[in-house]
Design a protein with these regions (language model features):
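Short, charged/polar low-complexity linear motifs in solvent-exposed/disordered segments
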Residues: 48-49, 66-68, 110-111
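A broad detector of short, well-ordered amphipathic alpha-helices
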Residues: 61-68, 72, 118
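RNase H catalytic domain
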Residues: 29-31, 72-150
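N-terminal accessory interaction module
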Residues: 1-3
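RNase H-like nuclease fold core
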Residues: 8-61, 72-73, 148
Length: 151
């Protein structure tokens, strides 16, 4: 199937990404499956963090953890004005709600992932942040710079 393309006027209405930002993404082989996530500088794709792979994860969980990791990293460096791009509306919503609303079944094989989720949720509850969380407009801009390139 071909992806719908945007007209020049639609692209113009969306504008361009802010390159003074970081971008986060996750990759998951299978659902659930082996999941990893990372964050990069948007302008040059320099990797800031890479975590995983974690067994029995989901893409949404990875996107959520990547966003929280990015927020915490920027806060620790006093860079609270730098935007963070995600291509996951689900993860953006979960961060706003401070809750990873996954239906994934957890057992001994993915307990580490559950611990990470709880840690991320607690961090969101105990900390405030000012970084704008922005939607990466894939249809206008192509794949997010943090993409793992495995599609």
């Amino acid at each position: 199937t071909s992806k719908p393309t945007l007209s020049a006027s639609e692209k113009a209405a969306i504008g361009s990404p802010n390159l003074e930002s970081i971008s986060v993404d996750a990759a998951c082989s299978g659902n659930p499956g082996k999941m990893e996530y990372r964050g990069v500088l948007t302008h040059n794709k320099k990797q800031l963090f890479l975590k995983g792979p974690y067994p029995k994860g989901t893409n949404n969980i990875g996107e959520f953890l990547a966003l929280v990791h990015g927020i915490a990293l920027l806060k620790s460096k006093n860079k609270e004005s730098i935007p963070i791009y995600s291509d996951s509306r689900t993860a953006m919503s979960w961060v706003k709600q401070k809750k990873c609303k996954t239906n994934l079944h957890f057992d001994a094989s993915n307990k580490d992932l559950l611990d990470l989720i709880k840690r991320a949720e607690n961090w969101l509850k105990e900390n405030s942040f000012k970084n704008p969380i922005l939607k990466w407009e894939t249809k206008a801009w192509g794949e997010i710079p943090a993409d793992f390139g495995r599609k």
